[in-house]
Amino acid sequence: MEIGLLILLFSVSAYAMLAKKLSTTIITAPMVFLGIGFAVSQLGFISIGDAHETVYLIAEISLVVLLFLDASQINLRRLKRQNTWPLRMLLIGLPLSILIGTGFAYLFFPQWPWAMLALVAAILAPTDAALGQAVVSNESVPLNERQSLSVESGLNDGLALPVILFFASIVAMETGSQENEMSWLVFGFSQIFIGILVGALMGYSSGRLFLYSESKKISSTIYEGIGVLALTGTSYLMATLMGGNGFISAFVAGLAFGNSVKGHCRFIYQFTESEGQMLIWSSFVIIGLGLLPSAIEHLTFPVAGYILVSIFIVRPLAIYLSLIGTKAKTLTKVFMGFFGPRGLATALFALIISKDILGQYGHSVLIIAINAVWMSTLIHGIAAAPMANWYGAKIKVLKIKSRELARLKNRK
């Protein structure tokens, strides 16, 4: 096991030294660390048995922290005032992705109950900007598009989670995996409601306390990071103890806290750009190490077919429809629809749901989710840099042409 850990740590150091150069190529961080985890597992340096409990532990920690930090960086007032694209992608595109995905899932898995089909579609709906970093950080892509994709990926995992829990509850009822069906449904709703309530109260009150201590100069920026991470864990544990869902609580707490402090807490952004990256890399290593071997072993044609349809048809169609009526060009709608890579949220949601809720269908959900992550990592990772450059150049030409046409019309 020590040799495996040595390889992992050496790989992290090597990637960190080459990160700037690699960011301009088709090689992405998720691709590298997913591959390293898989290779170490296959070579026998770290066995899956050794990593089994670690997978769940890191999954829970990663999901709690990332949900909180993603939500805390979203300015709700600015989101309302500025570009409507991300709002439409979230409020129209996300439900459409789940609806269309459910329909296509039936074609591949007709024997499954409808709630199971909807659950799989909901788990594949969230996107991960980390897999398309070459797009959101490429300045040749217009700012509107980059911001829209970043905001959408920051919020859609938290918005999809209540839907995932709802369908998971129905699956438990339909498959008889719970003795008291009504109590299980009530439990599902209480998880969502209490999670939202606790998260909102914890996030808002902590934000106000943070601003008060800052105004009275009784705190220090040195310790604000410790306080924020403690709040993240507190919101999760408090909701869990009160019978709510800790992940929903962490997301709502981040949203409430970030909009209360309104940019005063620099740690939120600094952690995401530094230590947060390490957390993301570790999660991909763990997925490659403990989950990917089994997922590939159980990959079937229906599973692969549904994943490809989800990547190339379901999300692009949903986003295209959600942007109808805006000033977005057809090329922009297609581009933003394609760049919805499935990443950590998909893997971690499936892992936690399969462990705690689903029973007999848990394995199937996990197989689809993990295979979706590695396939999306390759497809979107390879396409990100070249397509971002191509789109940036193409949209620039289209804008020049549209301005010229406008001038000609004005002259007439």
Model-derived segments and spans:
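Transmembrane helical cores of multi-pass secondary ion antiporters/exchangers
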Residues: 1-412
